[in-house]
Amino acid sequence: MSRHQAVLQLHFFASILETLLKDVNHPLSHFDKVSEDELDELWSWNTPLQPELRFCMHEKVSERAALHPEKIAIDAWDGTLTYGQIEDYSDKLAKLLRLLDDSSNRIIPVLFEKSRWTSVAVLAIMKSGACFALLDPAQPEGRLRAVVQQVNAKIFLSSKAQSTLAARVAPAATIIPISKSKFNKIFSPYTAEQPNTTLPPVSPDQPLYIQFTSGSTGVPKGCILTHSQYTSGAIPRAAAVGYYPHSRVLDFASYAFDVCIDSMLCTLAHGATLCTPSDERRMNDMSGAMRDMRVTFAGMTPSVARTLDVDILNNLESIALGGEGVSISDAMSWGQRTRVVNAYGPSEATVGATINDNVAAKPYITMGQRKGCALWLTEPEDHNKLVPVGAVGELLIEGPIVGNGYLNNPSKTKEVFIEDPEFLIKGSKSYPGRHGRIYKTGDLVRFDPDGDGEPIFVGRQDQQVKLRGQRIELAEIEFNMQKHLPPDTQLAAEVIKPSGGGEQTLVAFLVEQKKNGMRHLDGNVFGSFTNKFQSALRDMTKQLFVDLPSYMVPSAYIPLWKMPLLVSCKTDRKRLREIGASVTRQDLRRFNSAVSEKKEATTEMELKLQSLWAKVLGGDADFSANDNFFSMGGDSLRAMRLVAAARDEAIVLSVPDIMLNPTLSAMAEKAKPVSAEETNEVPPFSMIGKDWDADAARRESARLCGVDAANVEDVYPCTPLQEGLIALSAKFQDAYVAQRVATLPAKTALRLKEAFDTAVEGSPVLRTRIVNVTGRGLFQVVLKDGQLVREHGTDTSEYLRRDRNEPMDLGTALFRYGLVKEPESDQMNFVITMHHAVYDGWSMPLVFDHVNSAFNGLHTERPTSFKHFIKHLTSLDPADAQQYWKKRLEGTSPHQFPPLPQKGYTTQADSLLEHYVTVPTSAHSKLTLATIIRGAWALVSSLYIGHPDIVFGETLTGRSAPVPGIEQIEGPMITTVPIRVRLSLDRPITEYLQMIHAVTVKQIPHEHLGLQNIRRLSKDARVACDLRTGLVLHPKEDEDWGKVSLETPANTFLPASDEEGAREALKFNTYALMLVCTLEENGFLVMASFDSNCISKEAMERVLVVLDRIVHAFLGNPESKLGDVAVLDPAEARDAEAMRPRDVMSDSALGMSPVDGLESMDASLKELSPNEEKLRNILGRILGMKETDIRPSDSFFDLGGDSIGAMRLVSDARAQGLNLTVAQVFQSRSLSDLAASASNEREDKLAEILSRILGIAKSDIKSSDSFFELGGDSIGAMRLVSDARAQGLSITVAQVFQSKSLAELASSAEEEMPSQPKTNVDAPFIALGKDANLHSPDRVGVYLENQEWEITNIYPTRPLQQLAVEGTVDLPRYSLRYELIKFATPIDRQKLEQACQELVARNEVLRTVFVKDNELTLGVVLSALRVPYTETAVPEGEDADAFIQAGIKQDIEAPKPYGSSFVAFNLFTHPNGASTLVFRISHAQYDEICLPILFEQLSALYSGTTVPETVPFSKHVNHVVLDNIPKAIPYWENLLSGSEMTVLKPTIPLTHRGPADIYREFDISSRPANITIGSLPTAAWALVLSRRLNLTDVVFGEVVSGRNVGAPNADRIFGPTWQYIPFRVPFSKSWSYLDLLRYVQDQHMTSAAYESMGFSEIVKNCTNWDEDKVQWFDTVVHQAPAWVEELPFGNGVEAKFQTLYPHGEPLREWKCQAFVKEGGRKLGIEIVTFEEWIGEAEGVLEEVGKALECLMEGRVGESIF
């Protein structure tokens, strides 16, 4: 640590200490990593920001040409050009370019070999105002073509030699070859004939060039740089580098790299000479070319600079190095001969962002000073957080040199070009923050700790690799190696996968610079080291172990004759990895022997491990103490075996120990003898949780198992696998139960039964049952007596039948056995039955080996039992695995192979195919066969499904966990994980397979999370876990490993061979396709079990042929690219196209054509109409979606819209001049349909109405169309009923939904004759009926606060309204709501008050006061009411929010008597001009549907715009009381006949009844078609109650709008129409989940017409329930409506809303509240209950989530029971 850094850290320490002394409770998380002093220093380095230069570089070149026209500007191999000539030629060419095309945003590719004409072409394009893209003809044609296609080239400049290539890569472009003869004969005469015009000035904001770099997808990324961005960096950069008028600058860099732009433009702008050698000399005789051209300044990579002759360096004024890290030894060596400059800069921020113009000034290399920019270092995972000085962070560049982003790639641009990170806006104590655009480089850098602010390069983020779980920075290794080796040594560290399999290995490739000696004349890439160099390597290795962790020390040093280089002259790391793949483990040992000092194993542990290595790896025990396990041929499987072998010798090792300490000596230090603690048993009941004591656990589990408590030996949690298997057993009852029969001699069978009895005593897993403990989940219960023996008999068939009918589920035995005597025979049938929850393919042989030992009188003692594995699982932090899988599966494609025939289809394997893939040993010895199979299958799936993102499941042994003796544990540990593979056909096969291997290794610590838990992590995880293909790899065991004797009777229950074991695994197939591969020495057998409805047998046969072909291609051509082998023959291609989902467009990376023609392209590609644009804007706002996520082809229903959202849409649309109805919204098939929306006697009338309210032409409505097919929903039906009644047709909402066609609806409609007498339901006082005289205005008037108020109407309050009145008058006043309307800008206070009073005048419920007369609560409507309106000033210096809330608290505590106004306004004015209007209202006057209308009215009244009209609430009351309730009583009587209220009441006592809630969101994006979102929570809740309470008939409450009862204009009623109504679900045994959804939806539709009755009215009039006992629902489902958060108030005034309920509502029931999220893609569920029951609620919410999963496509067709 430097002195400067130490002072900073000391200050930081003092600051932290001072804070903690003042506040010992100060959270550690609140401390910043960067101290205030450090932050000031960082800002001082970056302030002021260097200015933007607003001119173009070609202007500077023109100035030089005017001053020195005869001076040589370009001295090239193909001729020279003066400044006057380049000015003249570029002017003429620029004019020609403008004549050909003067449109804006032109991009012109430039394709030249090294030539004097390249600079002319570039200057001409600059002057013409176009943008250039430089290309190198040495690059592959495919890449050139990709670039040309991206820029949409219309004009293409090339040299004469490259014109043919240009025409090939750009066949549609105009090719203009450039040469001297072209200028003389064509360009000059042509421009002379044109009018004499001058070139217009070019804006500095115009794009100057596009620099293409490699893209991660294989498609080049084009970064756009403008003139000013380039100039702002080039001018200060050139001054620092050393461009002078006398300079002769080498034009070395390939035209594919942006350094060549600096070489051209900086040279010419400074009046220097550009020296351009031919490509041939540039690559093969650089020193000679520089010598001949008298070069004084050159820029190149350090790798190239090392090849220069010494005299060249002596004659250079400066050499600029970049593109790679510069070693201090190189800098010191070259610095003695010339000035060494180090440059750094990504293409995205022009050519160079920093320049170190004196690299020899320090004993280490820095990147130098900022040029045209500011530099920041942030945490690599969070660009908002700066890192301290000296710490490594990601480099961020800010300033005028930051480019515009990537061409046609907004997502990548957004990812790395960021705006206003938090640290930039925040600033520091001495420097104010600022806005800025920043580029994230991905480079890891640290600031020089000496305090001058210069950065030091560490490496690339993506050059960080992981080896055996440890992150390794290759650059750090190289840096530390270079320090201890001769300065001219070339080296590169890499992680390779040696030939012959095994783990990845860290090695170093080195080139020793020998002055004499033979070159590699034989073509061998490998070199040799001199004795002196070997000695240096040995010394270096010792120092590496001091400087670095052991896992960062290379396992071998590979000598090369020559370091492979890319065209950019950087080290070719891909080639190094290829060389590494050709090296065997024996080669590595040979390379190492030359430099390693063989250290004999001396310690006792080293000697023990030496023999264990020999046992596991084979061969003699001659390993030295510094030998590396993985270099010697070890891999993960052998590591597992080493752990087991060590355990046999009483040595404790874990797989991670081996991975991280691979040398014999390091491993020996890590190994330790088995301790007493490790051999002790895990105490019984030690893993059940502290809140569940052993006695309670024993009693509860015994009750659930139906046994005595004394019989319970232990209880511990289930594994995720067991949980999943038990859950799946409910779905596929027999799928995970195996029944096996062995026919044996009677004596043998009886002895075998005794052996089983003995083995069961010593094998707890066989005595294990699984139970579901309420509120706790699934647990394993180990019984002392498992009660496993079944009665004997003499009829085997009958025994097997009874055995199959005996369930294996919760609380029952999961393993059982019995004997059946064969009649008239000395044979007996021994039958065992076992559930997969207690065994797997690994543990089954262990169990039967246990039995065999007992059969032979031997005792078996397992070192570890299943509960040791459980202990390990419970010790893990699930958050780590959750984070891994969530990130791993982010963005997963929903398209998997094979596709299902239709949504909701339940797969059932019915076909089996076998195919043998022959793999010669010589071929697959270089690669892991398991990895090859995974990679090949991913490619096969991708080819067939037409998508590059593939997911399939793989079942693993699960025995990689660090549990001693895990290989001997009797119990199921297999685990299934989703394998995700993203393919790019540009990727080499070897690299692709290495990627797959790396992923499988990385997932090992997280493989036991469980599919059911992974799928809950996110929507993407759920998609990924809906697996269609399952893969099982059965490796062939070594003869000495895992061999089970076949001579004992228990082995008759084992599969006779690997093939039979594979077939056994196929019996448990629940996938559409399951592949079991049995791996052998010379190949593998594939057994495919599949559902022929998903893929035909013929097609599957061809799929296996494709798999075979790709495996062979992988083995035979590992250097090829995936695209070279990704080929289907015509028959295979037809299969693929036939089964490919129609919404999949084949990824361009897969090289396939689109599945459908252009006509299938989404309408989102079309330009939106004005109406579509308006509607998309409204939908985005009310559904909470990004507008860009809403396509014209999306329907409101698909986007997650509901009736409330539809009403908001209609209201907002009308405000924008679009006349829509709610019914039209639901009817529309798409946004386009809705935007384009504009009928025989009764049918004709209805068609006319439908045409109007659904917005479609009458001619488009057919008699056979049903309302539901036309898109209707409850609100739309309500409008149809209302409008039909106005036309004299009487229909109900139920009739609308029940009618299958328009014709049927018309036939059910009754015509109302005008002569029929009608009751005036709008008459005042009519709702009081015969009691009107008892509650006259004169009588009621005495109860009013003001006797002068004029009464216009009186009505009886509705039941919920009455409760709300009581909740306003009495304490606690839970029905009072305070809406805070916040104005940030000044408002017209007088106008606001007028608007508030006018609001009351317009809405009768606001001028309604409530009185109590003879125990009847009445609503009294006043003709006029001036409600309280006050203004309060917030005192200066007061916290406004606290002051307002104190005022609200004071207000709610004040009396609110009957007869007074519940409505009041208080305007709080703030000293800064802001204000807050507090609006008080009672729930007796509103519900959540009408309140947004009220605020729209208030906004309109204030701004003077059109005010939306509302319907008086008293009209609704009249309609309900006089018309609807009489009709509703028979309906509710019929629905609730024979029912009773369902009670979900835990046994936990309630003490203070405080409310508590929990909330989770669930993915519902795959909900079934034609099922409304509102049906989902209701159906899910019904399922939860049914399952939890074991009921088939449930009744609970549901909150409804109360607006579907047929009243006219129901959507505009202002008042509390909402109701709680009963919902009943009488389950049928034959129901599927879809049947349930349809039943729920049908009941919603039917009951909508009768939803105005209150609960108390229904109980009293429609049921035989006890009114005293059933006063309220026990559980209620409520779908919450959307809410207004902000609203414009006109004249630039914006209002934000905040809601306060100072007094919480007393909780009376369980509430299940649903919230539609993300436009209907997610459903939020909140469970509200009492605090004491919140633990129970967590289980309830979990069950709701599981129920919702069953209601989604893919499962909805399954049977419930």
Swiss-Prot record:
Entries under CDD domains matching the protein: A_NRPS_SidN3_like (cd05918), CT_NRPS-like (cd19542), FUM14_C_NRPS-like (cd19545)
Segments for region (Condensation 1): 712-1135
UniProtKB keywords: Ligase, Multifunctional enzyme, Phosphopantetheine, Phosphoprotein
Any single GO CC term annotated in Swiss-Prot or TrEMBL for this entry: cytoplasm
Adenylation: region residues: 63-468
GO biological process: amino acid activation for nonribosomal peptide biosynthetic process; secondary metabolite biosynthetic process
GO molecular-function terms, A-Z: ligase activity; phosphopantetheine binding
InterPro entries documented for this protein: ACP-like_sf (IPR036736), AMP-bd_C_sf (IPR045851), AMP-binding_CS (IPR020845), AMP-dep_synth/lig_dom (IPR000873), ANL_N_sf (IPR042099), CAT-like_dom_sf (IPR023213), Condensatn (IPR001242), PKS_PP-bd (IPR020806)
Function per UniProt: NRPS involved in extracellular coprogen-type siderophores biosynthesis including coprogen, neocoprogen I and neocoprogen II. The role of extracellular siderophores in fungal virulence to plants is to supply iron to the fungus during plant infection, but not to act as phytotoxins, depriving their hosts of iron.
Family per record: Belongs to the NRP synthetase family.
Name of the molecule in the record: Nonribosomal peptide synthetase 6
Taxonomic source organism: Cochliobolus miyabeanus (Brown spot disease fungus)
Gene: NPS6
